[in-house]
Amino acid sequence: MNKYTKPLNTTSLVNTYKAARKRLFLFDYDGTLTPIVNNPADAQPTSALLHCLQLLCKDPANTTWVISGRDQLFLDTYLGSKIPRLGLSAEHGSFMKKADIYDWTDMLKDADMSWKEKALAIFEKYTQSNPGTVIEQKKSSITWHYRNASDIQKTYVCVCVYMCF
């Protein structure tokens, strides 16, 4: 038995795509549609990416979504305002915006977010003592970026933060 994924049969894929009456495309943003970069603000969509998404969204048989850890403003600015019929999911599903709808739906409107204060205090402690690390606050989450820290710091800090939680 082969334990590896078989190569994609592109002929079969194209035939299945053409025969389908409805198609669903779900794309992640960072690391999928755009490469992982040292500064998250630099991960802006290319004109080629926007063109591909526009082509997918123009086909009425397609339902296309971008699901991201990015916030609503970023997704609206770089994708939603440029591509009709594109659904958006911000902050890993915390906020949803159906295609061609102006308003976002807050999926966490009744959630207890009191945990953020304690988590932020822990992240601030480690950020101060670890050069190259930064805190990114969003409405529904706090992300601690350590990709620009040294490799030794990354390992040490990950273990320390894990022990805190």
Annotated model-derived regions:
Residues 23, 86, 142:
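Residue-level detector of short, conserved catalytic/binding motifs and their immediate flanks
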Residues 129-165:
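Conserved acidic, metal-coordinating active-site core of Asp-based
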Residues 41, 98, 154:
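Short acidic, gly/pro-rich beta-turn/loop elements at beta-sheet edges
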Residues 27-32, 91-93, 99, 138-139, ...:
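Short loop/turn segments at strand-loop or loop-helix junctions that form parts
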